[in-house]
Amino acid sequence: MASLGVNIDHIANVRQARRTVEPDPVPMALMAELGGADGITIHLREDRRHIQDRDLTLLGQTVRTRLNLEMAATTEMVEIALREQPDMVTLVPERREEVTTEGGLDVRSQCKSLSSVIDTLQSNDIPVSLFVDPDRNQLEACQQSGARWVELHTGRYAEASWREQPITLARLIEATEQARSMGLRVNAGHGLTYQNVEPIAAIAGMEELNIGHTIVARALCVGLQEAVREMKCLVQNPRRDPLFGSTSS
């Protein structure tokens, strides 16, 4: 049964749109936990477009589940992670011109530098996950890098047409099996919604789904606790066959 990590970046986006103090993502993280979140995910970007350093510090002091810090593999971010000691770091690619993370890390071409970052963090008791596309070559590079986890990028699945979705889903199923056979633990995320999450949650060996935008959007209608509760129900009780996405009897 997969667990649910709630990404609260989009709450900070609303705050930063007016450069003000509200909504504050710190108490909102508590509301997400009260709704059933198994963890809180934030992305501290180099340009600080949404989550700020004070958010990370305060969340580290207040989150009662676990705090997953998404970040680029830069010297500055490594220093921040070592200081703040999140429960996990997920290394992600980052480009200033992108609206959101657009693809997985190219671990193959950066394996040496990433290995150094991973070793530094894990030797300080911070487990590291790598955000990657569901590609065997990338998974092999993840294994070589020393990372213990991968987070599979579900963007292509989320954006696929109904004809293409079974193909992209099959790739994620295969990648999960491959990663686990290499000794890697598997999370997934990006673009998942209330409408498409169940087949991903039903994949054998999937440990956690990190979901943000759709939960925050739903919260505008029903409140954050209820929005998280609804998603948690789908993640923990998926009703769809993970190969074909059809409703089971």
Curated annotation (Swiss-Prot):
Its assembly, as annotated, is:
Homooctamer; tetramer of dimers.
GO CC terms, sorted: cytosol
Q: Which gene encodes it?
A: pdxJ
Q: Name one GO biological process term.
A: pyridoxine biosynthetic process
- Residue positions of the active site: H43 (proton acceptor), E70 (proton acceptor), H190 (proton donor)
Q: Where does 3-amino-2-oxopropyl phosphate bind?
A: N7, R18, G191, G212, H213
* PANTHER family, sorted: PYRIDOXINE 5'-PHOSPHATE SYNTHASE
Name it: Pyridoxine 5'-phosphate synthase
Q: Which UniProt keyword terms apply here?
A: Cytoplasm, Pyridoxine biosynthesis, Transferase
> Which NCBIfam families does this chain map to?
pdxJ, PRK05265.1-3, PRK05265.1-5
- Chief location: cytoplasm
Please list the residues that bind 1-deoxy-D-xylulose 5-phosphate.
Answer: D9, H10, R45, H50, T100
- Source species, please? Synechococcus sp. (strain CC9311)
Tell me which family the UniProt entry assigns to this protein: Belongs to the PNP synthase family.
Stated EC number for the protein is 2.6.99.2
